[in-house]
Regions:
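Helix-to-loop junctions at the C-terminal end of transmembrane segments
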Residues: 76-88, 172
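Extracytoplasmic gate region of multi-pass secondary transporters
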Residues: 22-67, 71-74
Length: 219
């Protein structure tokens, strides 16, 4: 099946080589990796975490863990879809990333199993905006990225969806089945998002200052 272009006004899109030369593209690839991993690290382990922490059956664990996670993640995306045009996307993503870090800490460090499960649900809300938000920021920053860019973003997100739970599982196994330590190891992914967002903001500020200096020198 043909891959149709997604460029404004039907203009020519960037080639894969041109896209890969853009540093900002790799920044968004890292963000997609972090978004996918931050989401799936908790969602894939939430049921087992509920069973282990609360001593409940798998059915109850699925309801207490993944369902609460998914419900709040869906709520966050509903809010973004309905009122996203009124929100400052970058501030919302940074706030969500920091909330995700806090949720990971609650899951891993709070001794009360019920509060840890609340952390799982809050994590679902915090990651809701990260994947679609990165797509939106990427399309705004690289308007000629086209279909190839979105395909690579999705690939990076899928790699994160695999890498996050894998890392958590490996650490859990090394730590004699301590799932909290596995989740704590996964905190590197929301922290990666925070760093990328802060770096991107500073990068744009530096570019804006350089442009202002150029305009003054020609004035």
């Amino acid at each position: 099946a043909p891959i149709y272009p997604l460029n404004p006004e039907g203009g020519a899109g960037l080639t894969l080589k041109e896209l890969c030369r853009k540093k900002v593209f790799w920044l968004f690839m890292l963000m997609m990796l972090g978004a996918g991993a931050a989401e799936n690290t908790v969602s894939q382990w939430a049921s087992a975490f509920a069973e282990e922490g609360l001593g409940v059956t798998k059915t109850v664990g699925d309801l207490a863990g993944p369902m609460a996670f998914a419900a709040l993640m869906g709520t966050a995306r509903l809010i973004y879809g309905k009122w996203g045009h009124k929100l400052h996307l970058e501030k919302c993503m940074l706030g969500s990333s920091l909330l995700c870090v806090a949720a990971y800490l609650a899951i891993a460090l709070v001794p009360n199993p019920f509060l840890s499960l609340v952390g799982c649900a809050v994590c679902g809300f915090s990651v809701g905006i990260l994947w679609p938000g990165t797509f939106s920021k990427g399309s705004a920053a690289i308007p000629k990225g086209g279909t190839v860019m979105f395909a690579l973003f999705a690939l990076a997100g899928d790699l994160g969806c695999s890498a996050g739970p894998t890392l958590a599982g490996m650490v859990t196994r090394v730590c004699d089945g301590n799932m909290r330590r596995g989740i704590l190891a996964g905190i590197v992914f929301p922290l990666l998002l925070v760093l990328c967002l802060v770096f991107g903001k500073k990068r744009r500020a530096a570019a804006g200052n350089a442009q202002a200096d150029t305009n003054r020198s020609h004035g």
